[in-house]
Structure formats: C-alpha cells, structure tokens
C-alpha cells in the first residue's frame, strides 16, 4: 500500500507554531498486518475530524510489518486530546499485544514548514530508536 498523502483536515494559520509527532509501529507477524491496517484506517478517519489537526500522513509497509504515521497539530494538547479520544484510545489498547516495537518522536516547527517530509520524519525516528536502544530519551521528551 502506498502512503496516504499529506491530508489537511483544518487550515493552518500562517507563521504559527505546530507540534509534530512521527511514529513507527512494527507488528509481530504478517498475520497481524490486516488487523493493524484496518484499525489504523479508523484512526486515520478520526484524525481528519480532530480539532487542532493541521495535517497527517500514513505510510504502510505491510510486507515489512511496519507502519509509519506523521502528523502536525496546533499544540501538544490537541494531539493528546486526539490520542485519548475514541476510537484511537481503544485501538491502541486493542493493538498493544500485536506490537513488536514502536518508536515515537516529537518536535516543534511552524506551519510554514507544512507539509512535512517523510525524509525528515524517518531521520528523526531512526535517531530516537537509537536513543531508545541505548536507554536514553530525547531531550525534552516526556
């Protein structure tokens, strides 16, 4: 499945701050892929209506058992409200047992830099995965 292109649920004001999250999920087996994909599409639909969502993209690599998300938000609170709301909250709880690994990275930018690029997101995810493997967290994370 190709990446779902950057979607802009709500217009972002010019020159405004934006809070970014990128994630990488790897499921245990190929048997877990269809379920994860279906659930991730439900979460994707939720993003398109979430208050404060400036943009999002999903990149599914089913044969590698890996899924990437990239999103930009008005602020950290808007992202957290989305993550705590249904269906996202229930989906994450339901899929927890299928996860082999996950990586999350957060950073701030401006709306002038949207849409975000996958190259930048993957670079930051790789750096965070290396920190996680070494037992450290990103500066300012948490």
Mark where each language-model region is.
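Short S/T/G/P-rich N-terminal loop/turn motif that feeds into the first structured element of a domain
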Residues: 1-66, 80-81, 103-142
């Amino acid at each position: 499945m190709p990446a779902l292109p950057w979607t802009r649920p709500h217009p972002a004001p010019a020159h405004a701050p934006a809070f970014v999250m990128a994630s990488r999920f790897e499921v245990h087996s190929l048997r877990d892929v269809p379920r994860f994909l279906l659930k991730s599409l439900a979460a994707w639909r939720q993003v398109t209506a979430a208050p404060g969502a400036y943009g999002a993209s999903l990149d599914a690599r089913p044969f590698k058992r890996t899924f990437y998300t990239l999103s930009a938000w008005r602020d950290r609170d808007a992202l957290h409200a989305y993550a705590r709301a249904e269906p996202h909250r229930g989906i994450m709880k339901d899929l927890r047992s299928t996860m082999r690994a996950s990586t999350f990275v957060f950073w701030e930018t401006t709306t002038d830099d949207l849409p975000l690029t996958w190259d930048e997101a993957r670079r930051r995810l790789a750096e965070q995965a290396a920190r996680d493997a070494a037992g450290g967290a990103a500066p300012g994370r948490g």
